[in-house]
């Protein structure tokens, strides 16, 4: 069945193009997350992962409902990627109580496209049956790249490459979509466009989503539920019942709360004052400039 294109237009990325100022209101409201009465798509009970003498995850319990959008926050080394790799089937979960759907797909920070295959063939990797090219084309049209069907990956921008990776994941109609910091390498403009695209794709396909991110604002804007992983355990859980598009008043207090759990401070970089040393400019011909001093560094 051919799926109607997502109602977003994505011409070639141009930083000079006019774009409305981003705010949570730019994301259209959506229905509430599925109720817990439904059978979960993901269920982990007492999950643990050790590498030698190092325990990365210990006694983790996690459920994700069909159609739920979950964001996973955590500091580096907290076990986020380890958990995602297990759910993706990249690491064995033998002997543990881990239930995941057979139909699942993952999108990484690096789009991981094969440069020797045209875009549509990257999307069609592993597909079986007839009309593979047409199915790939439909998926590319969904992400606004139907015109790049026969392009080579090296001719794509970073945002275009990530959209191809999304098309490759969703053409398989997964029950679970795993996103491992998929926007981290993108510029701010492209990142915001990708937020809207991912939400629209999620609404169209209604798969469950687990998104690993370091960006608290991104998690608040996109997710139904936010988890904080610390020391291999779920340290905090925030369920957001306010519809997308009405979260402006929620963003600031929730950001402060989550950053406090993560051990950070709100807008830490913005609050630091850059001070230039006075009367210490290098003389003409000197190659030794006075060091830049940053308060609180």
Where are these regions (language model features)?
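Hydrophobic anchor residue at the start of the ABC signature
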Residues: 166
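Conserved structural motif at the start of ABC-family nucleotide-binding domains
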Residues: 42, 57-59
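Conserved ABC ATPase signature
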Residues: 152-156, 160
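Helix-to-loop junction immediately C-terminal to a conserved catalytic motif
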Residues: 88
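Conserved beta-strand-loop-alpha-helix hinge in the C-terminal portion
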Residues: 231-257
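The feature captures the beta-strand-to-loop junction immediately N-terminal to the Walker
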Residues: 73-75
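A short, proline-enriched helix->beta-strand linker immediately N-terminal to the Walker B motif
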Residues: 171-175
């Amino acid at each position: 069945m051919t799926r109607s294109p997502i109602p977003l237009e994505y011409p070639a990325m141009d930083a000079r193009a006019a774009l409305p100022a981003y705010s949570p209101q730019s994301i259209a409201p959506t229905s509430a997350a599925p109720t817990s009465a439904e059978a979960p798509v993901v269920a982990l009970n007492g999950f643990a992962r050790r590498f030698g003498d190092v325990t990365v995850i210990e006694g983790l319990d996690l459920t994700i409902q069909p159609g739920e959008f979950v964001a996973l926050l955590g500091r580096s080394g907290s076990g986020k990627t380890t958990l995602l790799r297990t759910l993706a089937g990249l690491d064995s979960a033998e002997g543990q109580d881990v239930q995941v759907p057979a139909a699942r797909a993952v999108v990484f920070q690096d789009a991981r496209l094969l440069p020797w295959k045209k875009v549509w063939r990257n999307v069609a990797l592993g597909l079986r049956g007839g009309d593979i090219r047409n199915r790939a084309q439909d998926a590319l049209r969904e992400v606004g790249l139907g015109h790049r069907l026969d392009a080579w990956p090296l001719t794509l921008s970073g945002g275009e490459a990530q959209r191809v990776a999304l098309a490759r994941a969703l053409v398989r109609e997964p029950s679970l979509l795993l996103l491992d910091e998929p926007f981290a390498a993108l510029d701010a403009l492209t990142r915001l466009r990708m937020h809207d695209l991912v939400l629209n794709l999620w609404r169209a396909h209604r798969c469950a989503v687990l998104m690993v991110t370091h960006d608290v604002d991104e998690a608040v804007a996109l997710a139904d539920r936010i988890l904080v992983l610390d020391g291999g355990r779920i340290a905090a859980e925030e369920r957001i019942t306010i519809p997308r598009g009405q979260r402006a008043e929620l963003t600031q207090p929730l950001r402060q709360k989550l950053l406090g759990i993560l051990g950070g401070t709100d807008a830490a970089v913005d609050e630091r004052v850059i001070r230039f040393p006075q009367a210490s400019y290098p003389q003409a011909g000197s190659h030794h400039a006075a060091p830049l001093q940053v308060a609180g560094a």
